[in-house]
Amino acid sequence: MALATERAGFKQIAVEDFRITEEPYYLPISDEVQLFETAYRENVPVLLKGPTGAGKTRFVEYMSWRLHNRDGIGHAEGVPLITVACHEDLTASDLVGRYLLEGDETRWIDGPISRAVKNGAICYLDEIVEARKDTTVLIHPLTDYRRLLPLEKRGELLEAADGFLLVMSYNPGYQSALKDLKHSTRQRFIAIEFDYPPREQEAQIIAKESGVDPAIANELAKLAEKVRNLKEHGLGEGVSTRLLVYAGKLIHDGITPRRACQVSIVWALTDDQEVQRSIEEVVSSIFE
């Protein structure tokens, strides 16, 4: 029986036990599925490159589900998936593990990458360029034939279990001299590039994910194409497929298309009033 303070649907599990057991919706655009499956079989680390909201994380979830063993009645048990949202304060200890005080004793607590190595999981480092450069160096022994993770504080080496794969992602549009991958890191991965889908496929994704009418989904995909062309006129980044799905969900639940686009796209993309007006003009030309 759930505790009184817990809400329905709440779950708490160890990160190494997390599996995608239901198929996530993912529409392949090119040969990315075949490339990832081959990399997984050959223990080749994978780097995913692409703009925000282009489907990188959903792709990893889909591949985690797809790389599974099915039992006799068709139920799927996906490969364990451990995700780390990288940030500028992420340290090597955050990834590998650290000693913690418990009373008069110290106890070693594994970090997410150590747990992934031990359990044969996919370890997904999301937005890796946000992490400190000295942090990313620790993964180097995991990304070649050695497949080893040094635990310097314990004087140990962890040899990756079968099934372990290191996957990283980043947005090339956010690169700068201070936030870029070291060449010694980049050349340890194969790179799969993501971009926003062509209009027909994007409309299909919007309709499936939001439940909105296909005709509206097509108009949203058309809107996306036009808004992305504004990148050369002050817009920092094009509208993501994710935001289009949000707009579709609002429309599906009764919000007018123009209002849904205003809160999901116009205001979400920029605070620059001139750019906002430009986007609103595009919205008005499509949703009269």
Describe the predicted segments one by one.
Residues 257-288:
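C-terminal engagement/docking regions of AAA+ P-loop ATPases
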Residues 192-195, 234, 253, 270:
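A short, ordered amphipathic alpha-helix with a cationic face
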Residues 1-218, 222, 284-288:
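AAA+ P-loop NTPase catalytic core and its hallmark functional loops
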